[in-house]
């Protein structure tokens, strides 16, 4: 099959052909001065004998022909420029045989005047009467002036009252809006005061725990009989204090710093005092640097963090009364509201990392013989192996620990499986560790056994390029695929034909099973929408999520209820599939044409960019947490700046800050989030 393009470009909806022809009679000739431009009378209202046979309007400037017919002067003159005959009887006619018809002209003017007088408003009739010189006495004029003055005063009064009412309505509306805003701000301030008090109390508890810990260390140090018990006691005390620090949020760093000082004091009897203090100062300086860096990250994303905090605190107030009572008991027992605890978790995870660090790299020149796009990169069930596929027509399986721990020249695939066509997507079976599915540019979906390096099943029902395939987590024998033929097909590994076929009427770019149920799938398509289906009833989707402005290239589930999507409109979006609501839009990367990858875990989203960078977002914050730019020693600055390469695939390691990334040059990097 002939390959049209090498780059995996996201499909776009082709516009329907539209006709915009205009009929010849659409722009009809409107009579100029020779027509009825001076008359306001419609033809149906008057005798047809008064109409010009040429323009079919009231005759204006009537002229009589030698044969006895009357026309508008401009109409008959225009006609005689083209033909020398009468439009009515076809008798020979020239300009010299035209004569003014004064009587008819006067009659037509009177008829027009009578018609106007019948249809005119009383005001127009009164004005017409005055213009004609109607006799009116001075007394009648005075009465009319008085009447008009009173009418004017009344109209001005009504206009002023209306204006005042409009202004008053606006001010009332503005006041209500500002009062609502004030109430909201006051409520938010109350939340903040309560949380400040809770955090201050918790900080005092931490300081007291630190002091108790220091006292106990000194007591143990002064008692020779208990010195041998230090390690056990320290571990036990440290465990308790650490359990407190989990709830301490931003004060964990300070507490750990003080704790280290306490340890140094308890174990420095045999050391010079200066050395003990210098070690403490060094660690204190390091903690201070980390604290400053985290504060900078907070201020850089302050607006998003503020919105996140207020949203979580307000959600608590909107809960039913019974739930609020339970929450109040939680506050009394632990000192934190649920909203504050949730936000502290967000703040902690958001400020924990500031960069992506490369821990391993597989350069395309080391393994691949030519530059090639890695369209998909995926971890297996246990995160021990990962597979790559792309335009090289080959599935390569690597051992993750070997890639990370062994030298670069030893990083070779442990399995290679050749295919007939370029590959677009991979999906490991979530139960059968050695099974992996692929989709390719010919529309074939294949299930492979990586142990035997043989295909187990081949599904060839798709008529065009298949972009996506996914195994169900809950039903290991089921998988779903989507294609440019606008079809979504559900397959079972126990039979050759598709189980379910959905015609979407638009190119399918991505499909994904809900991790909690094999009954639900999300489908992203070139129609800019995400269609969420219950496979038990495919007559129509459960919901269609709208918001993207271009094709949806990826869909991924963070949880059973949270769905992330990527689009070539350079945005990621987060959706709630339980309540069918949009949650958040993420911006910062560039994606206008290509498949650049999307991967998610419980807290973070990561995607590629057409600037050859990897971007990481926290799910609660709309701007990137960090990014990493790919580079290669074989690529000069001019080539890199030209934007010829882009990130093509990304994949998180389960419950880990480690991520696999690949670009269109074929370079694979293992990145890890770092402070």
UniProtKB/Swiss-Prot annotation:
This is E3 ubiquitin-protein ligase COP1. Changing residue 465 to E: No interaction with BBX24/STO and BBX25/STH, and at low light intensity shorter hypocotyl. The record marks 422, 441 as: Human TRIB1 COP1-binding motif. Disruption phenotype: Abrogated induction of DHU1 in response to UV-B. The double mutant shw1 cop1 displays an enhanced photomorphogenic growth in the darkness as well as abnormal accumulation of HY5. The double mutant dhu1-1 cop1-6 phenotype resemble that of the single mutant cop1-6. The keyword Phosphoprotein does not apply. Residues 67-177 are annotated as: CLS (cytoplasmic localization signal). Autoubiquitinated. Residues 134-201 form a coiled coil. It comes from Arabidopsis thaliana. Homodimer. Interacts with HY5, HYH, BBX24/STO, BBX25/STH, CIP8, COP10, SPA1, SPA2, SPA3, SPA4 and UVR8 and phosphorylated PHYA. Light induces dissociation of the SPA1/COP1 complex. Interacts with HRT/RPP8 and triggers it to the 26s proteasome. Binds to CRY2; this competitive interaction prevents triggering to proteasome of other binding proteins. Binds to SHW1 in the nucleus. Bonds to CIP7. Interacts with CSU2. Binds to CIP1. Interacts directly with DHU1. Associates to UNE10/PIF8. Binds directly to PCH1 and PCHL. A motif (Bipartite nuclear localization signal) lies at residues 294-317. Signal peptide: none annotated. Its main location: nucleus. Pathway: Protein modification; protein ubiquitination. Residues 120-177 are annotated as: SNLS (subnuclear localization signal). It comes from the Eukaryota. Zn(2+) 1 binds at residues 52, 55, 72, 75. A zinc finger (RING-type) spans 52-90. Residues 1-40, 261-290 are annotated as: Disordered.
């Amino acid at each position: 099959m002939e390959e049209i393009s090498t780059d995996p470009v996201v499909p776009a909806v082709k516009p329907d052909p539209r006709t915009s022809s205009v009929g010849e009679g659409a722009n009809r000739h409107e009579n100029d001065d020779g027509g009825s431009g001076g008359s306001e009378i419609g033809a149906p209202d008057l005798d047809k004998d008064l109409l010009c046979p040429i323009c079919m309007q009231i005759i204006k400037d009537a002229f009589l022909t030698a044969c006895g017919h009357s026309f508008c002067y401009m109409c008959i003159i225009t006609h005689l420029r083209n033909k020398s005959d009468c439009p009515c009887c076809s008798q020979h006619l020239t300009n010299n045989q035209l004569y003014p018809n004064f009587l008819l002209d006067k009659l037509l003017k009177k008829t027009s005047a009578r018609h106007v007088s019948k249809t005119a408003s009383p005001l127009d009739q009164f004005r017409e009467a005055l213009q004609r010189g109607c006799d009116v006495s001075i007394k009648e004029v005075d009465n009319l002036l008085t009447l008009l003055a009173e009418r004017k005063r009344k109209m001005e009064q009504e206009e002023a009252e209306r204006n005042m009412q409009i202004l008053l309505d606006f001010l009332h509306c503005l006041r209500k809006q500002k009062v609502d805003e004030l109430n909201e701000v006051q409520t938010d301030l109350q939340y903040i005061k309560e949380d400040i008090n809770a955090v201050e109390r918790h900080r005092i508890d931490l300081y007291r725990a630190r002091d108790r810990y220091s006292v106990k260390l000194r007591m143990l140090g002064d008692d020779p009989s208990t010195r041998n018990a230090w390690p056990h006691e320290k571990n036990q005390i440290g465990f308790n204090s650490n359990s407190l620090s989990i709830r301490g949020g931003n004060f964990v760093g300070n507490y750990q710093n003080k704790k280290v000082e306490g340890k140094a004091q308890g174990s420095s009897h045999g050391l010079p005092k200066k050395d003990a203090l210098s070690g403490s100062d060094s660690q204190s300086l390091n903690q201070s640097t980390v604290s400053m860096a985290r504060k900078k990250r907070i201020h850089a994303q302050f607006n998003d963090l503020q919105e996140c905090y207020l949203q979580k605190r307000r959600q608590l107030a909107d809960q039913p009364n019974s739930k609020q009572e339970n929450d109040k008991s939680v506050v009394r027992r632990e000192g934190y509201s649920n909203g504050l605890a949730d936000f502290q978790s967000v703040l902690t995870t958001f400020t924990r990392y500031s960069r992506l660090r490369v821990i391993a790299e597989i350069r395309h020149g080391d393994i691949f013989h030519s530059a090639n796009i890695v369209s998909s990169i995926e971890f297996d069930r246990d995160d021990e192996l990962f597979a790559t596929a792309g335009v090289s027509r080959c599935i390569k399986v690597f051992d993750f620990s070997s890639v990370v721990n062994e030298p670069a020249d030893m990083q070779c695939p442990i399995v290679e499986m050749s295919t007939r066509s370029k590959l677009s997507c991979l999906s490991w079976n979530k139960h059968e560790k050695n099974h992996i599915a692929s989709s390719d540019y010919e529309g074939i979906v294949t299930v492979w056994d990586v142990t035997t390096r043989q295909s187990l099943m081949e599904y060839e029902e798709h008529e065009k390029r298949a972009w996506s395939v996914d195994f169900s987590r809950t039903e290991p024998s089921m998988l779903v695929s989507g294609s440019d033929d606008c079809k979504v097909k559900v397959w079972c590994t126990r039979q050759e034909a598709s189980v379910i076929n959905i015609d979407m009427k638009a190119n399918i770019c991505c499909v994904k099973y809900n991790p909690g149920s094999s009954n639900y799938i999300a489908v992203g398509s070139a129609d800019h929408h995400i269609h969420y289906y219950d496979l038990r009833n495919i007559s129509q989707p459960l919901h269609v999520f709208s918001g993207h402005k271009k094709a949806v290239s990826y869909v991924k589930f963070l949880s059973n209820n949270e769905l992330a999507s990527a689009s070539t409109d350079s945005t990621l979006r987060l959706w709630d599939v339980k309540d069918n609501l949009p949650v958040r839009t993420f911006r910062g990367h560039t994606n206008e044409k290509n498949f650049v990858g999307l991967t998610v875990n419980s807290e973070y989203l990561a995607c590629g960019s057409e600037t050859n960078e990897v971007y990481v977002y926290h799910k609660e914050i709309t701007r990137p947490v960090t990014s990493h730019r790919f580079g290669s020693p074989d690529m000069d600055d001019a080539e890199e700046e030209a934007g010829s390469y882009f990130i093509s695939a990304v994949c998180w390691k389960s419950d880990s800050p480690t991520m696999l990334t690949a670009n269109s040059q074929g370079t694979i990097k293992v990145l890890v989030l770092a402070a």
